[in-house]
Amino acid sequence: MNRKDSKRKSHQECTGKIGGRGRPRQVRRHKTCPSPREISKVMASMNLGLLSEGGCSEDELLEKCIQSFDSAGSLCHEDHMLNMVLAMHSWVLPSADLAARLLTSYQKATGDTQELRRLQICHLVRYWLMRHPEVMHQDPQLEEVIGRFWATVAREGNSAQRRLGDSSDLLSPGGPGPPLPMSSPGLGKKRKVSLLFDHLETGELAQHLTYLEFRSFQAITPQDLRSYVLQGSVRGCPALEGSVGLSNSVSRWVQVMVLSRPGPLQRAQVLDKFIHVAQRLHQLQNFNTLMAVTGGLCHSAISRLKDSHAHLSPDSTKALLELTELLASHNNYARYRRTWAGCAGFRLPVLGVHLKDLVSLHEAQPDRLPDGRLHLPKLNNLYLRLQELVALQGQHPPCSANEDLLHLLTLSLDLFYTEDEIYELSYAREPRCPKSLPPSPFNAPLVVEWAPGVTPKPDRVTLGRHVEQLVESVFKNYDPEGRGTISQEDFERLSGNFPFACHGLHPPPRQGRGSFSREELTGYLLRASAICSKLGLAFLHTFHEVTFRKPTFCDSCSGFLWGVTKQGYRCRECGLCCHKHCRDQVKVECKKRPGAKGDAGPPGAPVPSTPAPHASCGSEENHSYTLSLEPETGCQLRHAWTQTESPHPSWETDTVPCPVMDPPSTASSKLDS
């Protein structure tokens, strides 16, 4: 027998000892460190102690929490179980019921240990309110039960127990507040901060997007996460809905900013800029905004722009491919999870992926065992995942933010474009071509929008506040002398900075030649924002309810308004009348009458008319696109990002008028064939 046969025989003997060829050998690791997941699992089992073997009833769990305190209020043992119960009990038991059980236990305490047990219960309630002060403000029933508890303590308890309920810091909000915006260092009175998109550095833009993302992420509470897991929707959770809406708004903003440029080379420059922004977001470990920006760049309305992508450099195309693969949903976001596990320091997760994990954990196991006891291992696993997210909210961002640039981004993200509108503009920029085209530089989008459709419209009050904040920032940086006006050049640059209807709208009437006042800029941005955000032109009217004592007709539907039962609304500024149900459907812009209340113009100034915009065509650089606010009425308004000629004489360009081409039908397939 040679050495080779000897090795084969020895190998067969070894395999036979473990059950022959039919049974696979058990894979064992030798002299290797356990993975972080294994360490967390073991630590969780140790923290649960004997209860990890099964479950326990609500009374047993409550008793364990009470016995965690001594007479001085110190914890007798490790506080993991106590913190887990206080944070997770609402998943299986309402907080008001838990407080009622504590009140009952306090009232039933008798015997030699009565004072000690009551003192322990008071320490537990105080500890609960100090660690989770937000639950009192979000649950009126819990607030009522806690009030009865402290009233009982004040009536039946001793001085030591009453002192625990007298502290004024019981309901003080815990945790770090949102990061404070900081102005750029060295900002002098005469220095301007550029508020133009083309002038913003990619790193600066990424930092401000990270600030907005972190501020939105900090507002999410464990109660919001629980509500999402139990209901399967972000509706009813304003903070969580706002975070999802911010991500979707960033994605839409990226798409519209790319499509706002008339030529392929200009669109390629915007694409390249956002690719560098995405790379900077990756360096900042802001994966949630990175997902939004990359998703916008990989959207089919953008990926079909082959003429634009042809101008991208190979390095930019490669970088976009790498980011797309990093955030791809293949194998349950395996590449992102590996990257996230190796991150340290400041980082922001892809919220949708981690919420998906919470849902999976919740659905995988029941809340209670067959005998009715609570399933503690499940609650503990959920608690560990929630604590990871809560710990991330206590981070300190590595970058500061300029308040003026935040106002610019906030108003820019207050857009509300539908998928159909974005596709129509995409086809208007690069129509379908029957000739064969080179393949797209990257595949169909791999990055998915985890909560599609959650892009809430800004309400009138919020939008007005954002406009006022931006106007303040504009005049602070573009009018350092305090003259109260900005130049026409600055106005044109600012109006072209937004992806909503600015270029196609009639500019505000100027009181002085070549300058625009604060009121003119405010009214202009309000009018453009109202159209873009689908709030309607009624947003610009100041309606008040009136009773018409003489025959009047509605300016919206031409219906009759007369009598006590025919109350309607009249605009204080222009006198327009309409029904209550027609108020939000007004298609006439508010024209302030001379001498009317709130008129910003000089006395006797003529009211400027707004002629209907006429079409322009010619080269692809001047290709126009029209959006119908009311398709059935044919009311057409031009969008800002289309570079069309203006009806105002001073804004006319050298283009040849021709009929407007109808945009491609959106009923067909949205993917470029």
Swiss-Prot record:
Q: Is Lyase included in the keywords of this UniProt record? A: no
User: Matching SUPFAM superfamilies, A to Z?
Assistant: Cysteine-rich domain, Ras GEF
Q: Does the keyword Membrane apply?
A: yes
Task: Tell me a GO biological process for this protein.
Answer: positive regulation of natural killer cell mediated immunity
Query: Which residues belong to any copy of the Ras-GEF domain?
Result: 201-432
For the region Disordered, what residue ranges are annotated?
Answer: 1-30, 160-187, 593-621, 639-673
Q: In which tissues is it expressed?
A: Expressed by mast cells and their progenitors (at protein level). Specifically expressed in mononuclear leukocytes. Highly expressed in myeloid cells compared to lymphoid cells. Also detected in heart, skeletal muscle, spleen, liver, placenta and lung. Not detected in brain. Isoform 1 is the major isoform in normal individuals. Isoform 2 is more significantly expressed in a patient with asthma. Isoform 3 is more significantly expressed in a patient with asthma and a mastocytosis patient.
According to its record, what is known about the domains?
The phorbol-ester/DAG-type zinc finger mediates the binding and the functional activation by DAG.
What name does UniProt use for this protein? RAS guanyl-releasing protein 4
Q: Which organism is it from?
A: Homo sapiens (Human)
Recall the taxonomic lineage recorded for the source organism: Eukaryota, Metazoa, Chordata, Craniata, Vertebrata
